[in-house]
């Protein structure tokens, strides 16, 4: 038995060495194709002019850190979740609260609006994803109509509806992502490949096919085929946890934000990292990233309470937005691109335009 164990260890060790050498060869092949930098290609592009954005609305009502938020497709309503165990639906025009749900646990780390605008999903330390239908009847008990959809073996870190209300994609601290049927709660596909907690995910724009990207504590960003459950591309250039990933509007690239204080842009067709957004003066991690509708700007929320706005093509910072009094934890551009909303550990959300 002992010799069997030795053989197994030797086999594992040799496989690890082989995997590393193959990785090295892959990197060499990638490097051969790496003939030009994005900022060199963008040299002829005109620089962006004066950039001004201000806080237009402040949403107050959470009793603790805001951890996640999402826009409704109607471009008006926002759902947010917090460490106080509450999930609130806001009217961003009037700052009124339209619905509130108290979850059975605190640390509600994930929330999402259904494409129809008729339901929300949320979850966190309860290890599951719950879906609540939204009605116009203010007296109706939303909790009574709750559906428990997804069950993980560790905390839920992110969730997102697919292009319909019928399926939901989740990411978890158990190192997996999963696709679920909302009606039956059945697991449709699971995605294994991360070596540590998965912290974030984003679905490819609907025109570009059935893929999504995830990032986690293993410093890897992975692109998955939702039909096969296979990882089709992986990128490992960050030096710390990846907190946020977001597809470029065309679906041909994605950005990531990490605790290593950088944001990076990966081109899926070139199969490599094409830009790094960083400055020596930025020493705090990036918690959340999102693109403007055109894809020219990258908004990034940081743990130093600021939001930095980057010129995607030139790699230069075009603005810093101040206002939050604690770390920015979540950030999303509205569906029509006219504004974006940020959530913070200072218990508030801010709408900027």
From Swiss-Prot:
- The molecule here is called Guanine nucleotide-binding protein subunit beta-5
Q: Which PANTHER family match?
A: GUANINE NUCLEOTIDE-BINDING PROTEIN BETA G PROTEIN BETA
Any idea what job this protein has?
Answer: Enhances GTPase-activating protein (GAP) activity of regulator of G protein signaling (RGS) proteins, such as RGS7 and RGS9, hence involved in the termination of the signaling initiated by the G protein coupled receptors (GPCRs) by accelerating the GTP hydrolysis on the G-alpha subunits, thereby promoting their inactivation. Increases RGS7 GTPase-activating protein (GAP) activity, thereby regulating mood and cognition. Increases RGS9 GTPase-activating protein (GAP) activity, hence contributes to the deactivation of G protein signaling initiated by D(2) dopamine receptors.
Which domain of life does the UniProt lineage start with? Answer: Eukaryota
Q: What does the sequence similarity comment in the record state about its family? A: Belongs to the WD repeat G protein beta family.
What would be one Gene Ontology cellular-component term for the protein? Answer: plasma membrane
> How does it associate, per the subunit comment?
Component of a complex composed of RGS9 (isoform RGS9-1), GNB5 and RGS9BP; within this complex, the presence of GNB5 stabilizes both itself and RGS9 and increases RGS9 GTPase-activating protein (GAP) activity. Interacts with RGS7, forming the RGS7-GNB5 complex; within this complex, the presence of GNB5 increases RGS7 GTPase-activating protein (GAP) activity. Interacts with GPR158; promotes the GTPase activator activity of the RGS7-GNB5 complex in absence of glycine, in contrast GTPase activator activity of the RGS7-GNB5 complex is inhibited in presence of glycine. Interacts with RGS6.
Cite the entry's keywords alphabetically. Answer: Membrane, Repeat, Transducer, WD repeat
């Amino acid at each position: 038995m002992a010799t069997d164990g030795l053989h197994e260890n030797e086999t594992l060790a040799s496989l690890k060495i082989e995997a590393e050498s193959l990785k090295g060869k892959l990197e060499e092949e990638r490097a051969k194709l790496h003939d030009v930098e994005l900022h060199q290609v963008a040299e002829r592009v005109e620089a962006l002019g004066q950039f001004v954005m201000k806080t237009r609305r402040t949403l107050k009502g959470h009793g603790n850190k805001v951890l996640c938020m999402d826009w409704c497709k109607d471009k008006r309503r926002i759902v947010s979740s917090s460490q106080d165990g509450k999930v609130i639906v806001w009217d961003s025009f009037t700052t009124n609260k339209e619905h509130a749900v108290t979850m059975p646990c605190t640390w509600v780390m994930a929330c999402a609006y259904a494409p129809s605008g008729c339901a929300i999903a949320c979850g966190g330390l309860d290890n599951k994803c719950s879906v609540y239908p939204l009605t116009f009847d203010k007296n109706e008990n939303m909790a009574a109509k709750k559906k428990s959809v997804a069950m993980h073996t560790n905390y839920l870190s992110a969730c997102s509806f697919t292009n319909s209300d019928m399926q939901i994609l989740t990411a978890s601290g158990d190192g997996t992502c999963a696709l679920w049927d909302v009606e039956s709660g059945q697991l449709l596909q699971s995605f294994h490949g991360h070596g540590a907690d998965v912290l974030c995910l984003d679905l490819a724009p609907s025109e570009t096919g059935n893929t999504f990207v995830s990032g986690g504590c293993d410093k890897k960003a992975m692109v998955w085929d939702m039909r096969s459950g296979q990882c089709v591309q992986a990128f490992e250039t960050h030096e710390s946890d990846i907190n946020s990933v977001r597809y470029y509007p065309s679906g041909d690239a994605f950005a990531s934000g990490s605790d290593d204080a950088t944001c990076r842009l990966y081109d899926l067709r070139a199969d490599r990292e094409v830009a790094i957004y960083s400055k020596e003066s930025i020493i705090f991690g990036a918690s959340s990233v999102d693109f403007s509708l055109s894809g020219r700007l990258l908004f990034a929320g940081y743990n130093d309470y600021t939001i930095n706005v980057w010129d995607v093509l030139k790699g230069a910072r075009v603005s810093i937005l101040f206002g939050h009094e604690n770390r920015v934890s979540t950030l999303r551009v509205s569906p029509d691109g006219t504004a974006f909303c940020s959530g913070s550990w200072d218990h508030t959300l801010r709408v900027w335009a």
